[in-house]
A protein has these predicted regions:
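Charge-dense, low-complexity intrinsically disordered segments
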Residues: 29, 33-36, 144, 178-182
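Amphipathic alpha-helical segments within well-ordered protein domains
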Residues: 22, 47-51, 100-105, 174
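Alpha-helical scaffold segments in carbohydrate-active enzymes
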Residues: 45-48, 156, 190, 194
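Divalent metal-dependent catalytic cores for phosphoryl transfer on phosphate-bearing substrates
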Residues: 61-170
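Exposed alpha-helical structural elements
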Residues: 16-23, 65, 111, 115, ...
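Charged phosphate-binding loop/patch that engages nucleotide di/tri-phosphates or the phosphate backbone
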Residues: 177-198
Length: 198
């Protein structure tokens, strides 16, 4: 009965996420190691959350896709200016999701690309973007599918700046989003209601 609610992508092989990352990142550099560590942390939690949804709420979830998308969600950081996490590009860090989408779109990974674009914060609405004058497209960048929401939520429990720290508690993850306003907190709270404590 459990397996009937897990959606596995039977019509394709799982993609080689490490191979995709290595197209853009030099292996065993500080940035590569940080990205792999963070993405693996997020992927493990995202898989656990996905399976919990299947087991407790009997919701169909594409677990393979969740794992793949979690590994690739931050692929765009390489082009950003964030030296504290070894990123020496020119783009503002807030654009890493948009950049990641473009990278994965070019590879034909359109569904994975949307996760890149929609995982920042608890998603960004056009109102958030305009109010904060963010250097992003003027459109909603909100996680829509269940899988997108799982990866977005799981990402909030880990820090690239402090990759060796334990996963954040729900209250700490929520507190990190307070500065982004009530709408962001409301979206996070809805995800927390759906997915629970990590």
């Amino acid at each position: 009965m459990l397996r009937t609610n897990v959606f596995f992508s039977l019509n394709k092989e799982m993609i080689n996420t490490i191979g995709i990352i290595e197209r853009f990142y030099e292996k065993n550099t500080p940035l590569y190691n940080l990205l792999i560590k963070h993405s693996t942390q997020v992927a493990k939690l995202a898989q656990r959350l996905a399976m919990r949804l299947v087991e407790l709420k009997h919701q169909p979830v594409d677990v393979e896709f969740v794992s793949e998308a979690a590994m690739l969600h931050d692929i765009g950081i390489i082009a950003t200016d964030a030296p504290g996490i070894y990123c020496n590009g020119n783009e503002p860090y807030i654009r890493h999701g948009i950049i990641g989408r473009a990278m994965l779109d070019e590879m034909g990974l359109y569904r994975h690309a949307l996760v890149c674009e929609r995982h920042t914060g608890a998603g960004l609405s056009i109102t958030d973007i305009e109010k904060q004058n963010l250097p992003l497209p003027h459109r909603d960048l909100l996680p829509l599918s269940l899988e997108e929401k799982i990866v977005c939520y799981a990402d909030k429990f880990f820090s690239k700046s402090h990759p060796d720290d334990q996963a954040r508690t729900l209250s700490v993850a929520r507190s990190k989003l307070l500065k982004f306003g009530d709408d962001t907190i409301a979206r996070f709270d809805m995800m927390a209601t759906l997915f629970g404590e990590p």
